[in-house]
Regions:
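RNA-binding accessory domains that recognize and position tRNA/RNA substrates
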Residues: 73-114, 133-138
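Short, well-ordered secondary-structure micro-motifs within conserved domains or adaptor modules
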Residues: 25-64, 68-70, 79
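A C-terminal junction/extension of Radical SAM enzymes
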Residues: 27-31, 36-39, 356-433
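Canonical Radical SAM [4Fe-4S] cluster-binding loop centered on the CxxxCxxC motif
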Residues: 157-192
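Short Lys/Arg-enriched alpha/beta "domain-start" segment
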Residues: 1-35
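N-terminal [4Fe-4S]-dependent radical SAM core
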Residues: 90-94, 114-160, 209
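Conserved non-cysteine loop/helix-boundary elements of the Radical SAM core domain that shape
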Residues: 178-381
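Conserved small/polar residues in nucleotide/adenosyl-binding loops
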Residues: 471-480
Length: 482
């Protein structure tokens, strides 16, 4: 796709909107249309002293939208609305989030409602950004529930993120930096050795600054790809070096059911872990096979039962709308099964095909559900979970998600994941350890966030650890940085 930008500074906006309509097209932003182009999808966006004009073209079909402007016109918004309406009409599609892009819609809602009022925020979302009433209601509910969690954080609060970038196998939709245990077995033990060291070193800075630990979260990857002994070592490093007296939540992703054992669960429980996530993604074996999960529905049910036997009373289950081989009946069955098990929280993601995912790279084939079906899946999950008493407490969006839809965390009241909210809202500092981890240092006065990136891959983390690892905090030892 070619997007031509003439005489205006809104190339970022129109490029983002182009990705909503054409998420898998390579988008080229140019200042003029080439004479010899072979692209069949074109957008020409231009602004003069008194008019904004957008021409949308797909093969032989063309639609032109324009609007007169003056000194007081919001030209950025007008350009975006014209672009959206032109392609929406041309393709016969509309998106419930309208022209709103960005990861954190609830945070945007917070800023508008704090600056104006909730009623004004609704009007802006609906009139300016073309957000549907359903999504308006959702974002307002999420923001309300988020506020209850955000208010728990204090000026010197922080959370700890522990990265375990290993999985049994790589799922076909995944683009995260994670390594198959089968291919990276030799890296796991030295990785854990260094992770324990980094935890201890990181704790020194947190303790010296008098920071208050609110939540601990192990992510990845699949943390339970580690052995019971390795999990115990990581947990012991945390309890030996950090004060857990203020800890509100301790979560471990036990994402792949085929990694869950009674020994690992016992190790986590004895370490004080109170919340785990067992992620089926689907309760349909054909879907699981299609996405390379290499576990069965039976294994998920068994893992959940083991977790209950081990005493876990706060279990999350993740699902993805839009997976290959899935349909609305199968998706409904998955959500209904999670609730029949009594899962305390359910997170519903929309399939997002990133560049590094196997589903994208294999022959450039995109095997996924159609947009209308995915919309129905997401709508069903909202209605069913809400009707069962679950509340939406956490939401984020990603580029290249099917239908430009959202990911939402639902929970029984009181079972929300605090870390998810703290992290997504950027409520306070997050100290992150391990390969691929990103520390977020928040200035409590200005609110400014500084990101510090650890080594991306386990082999880099291991080979370079003694050179620069964990010293990244030394430049930030004064409280004003945190």
């Amino acid at each position: 796709m070619i997007v031509v930008v003439k005489n205006h500074p809104y190339s970022y906006d129109v490029e983002n909107l182009a990705e909503i309509f054409f998420p898998y097209e390579k988008i080229k932003v140019l200042s003029q249309l080439p004479f010899d182009t072979e692209d069949n999808i074109l957008a020409v966006t231009e602004m003069s002293a008194d008019e904004i004009r957008v021409e949308a073209r797909v093969f032989e079909k063309v639609i032109i939208k324009s609007e007169k402007i003056g000194k007081e016109s919001d030209c950025q918004n007008i350009m975006s609305v014209l672009f959206y309406r032109a392609f929406s009409e041309l393709l016969g599609v509309s998106y419930p989030w309208g022209i709103l892009y960005g990861v954190r819609p609830a945070r945007f809602w917070h800023s508008l409602s704090d600056k104006y009022s909730k009623e004004r925020a609704r009007n802006i979302f609906e009139q300016k950004y073309l957000v549907s009433p359903k999504k308006l209601d959702l974002v307002a509910r999420v923001a309300e529930n988020e506020n209850k969690i955000i208010s728990l954080s204090q000026k010197n609060s922080f959370s700890l993120y522990v990265s375990v970038p290993f999985c049994p196998t790589r799922c076909s939709y995944c683009s995260f930096v994670s390594h198959s245990i089968e291919k990276a077995a030799a890296l796991v033990e030295p990785y854990v050795d260094l992770l324990v060291r980094e935890i201890a070193e990181t704790a020194k800075y947190a303790n010296d600054l008098g920071l208050r630990l609110e939540s601990v979260y192990y992510g990845g990857g699949t943390p339970t790809a580690l052995s019971a002994n390795q999990l115990s070592r990581v947990a012991k490093a945390i309890s030996d070096n950090f004060s857990l007296s203020t800890l509100r939540e301790y979560t471990v992703e036990a994402g792949r059911p085929d990694t869950v054992t009674s020994e690992k669960l016992a190790a986590l429980k004895s370490a004080g872990v109170g919340r785990i996530s067992i992620n089926p993604q689907s309760f349909n074996d054909d879907v699981l096979a299609a996405i390379g999960r290499r576990h069965t529905v039976r294994q998920t049910l068994d893992a959940f039962a083991l977790a209950r036997e081990a005493g876990f009373d706060n279990i999350n289950m993740d699902f993805i709308a839009g997976l290959p081989k899935d349909d609305i009946k199968s998706f409904k069955h998955s959500i209904e099964t999670a609730l029949s098990l009594g899962a305390e929280s359910v997170t519903v993601h929309t399939l997002c095909l990133k560049t590094g995912a196997y589903m994208v790279t294999r022959d450039n084939v995109f095997d996924h559900g159609d947009i209308d079906t995915v919309n129905k899946m997401v709508d069903f999950s909202r209605e069913y979970l809400s009707g069962a008493g679950y509340v939406p407490y956490y939401m984020y969006r990603q580029g290249k998600s099917l239908g430009n839809l959202e990911n939402v965390g639902w929970s029984k009241p009181g079972s929300e994941c605090l870390y998810n909210v703290f992290m997504m809202d950027e409520t306070h500092t997050v100290l992150a350890v391990g390969a691929g981890a990103v520390t977020r240092l928040k200035n409590p006065v200005s609110g400014k966030i500084e990101r510090i990136y650890n080594y991306k891959y386990p082999y880099e983390y291991i080979s370079g650890f003694d050179t620069v690892s964990y010293t990244h905090l030394r430049a930030h030892e004064t409280p004003e940085h945190l």
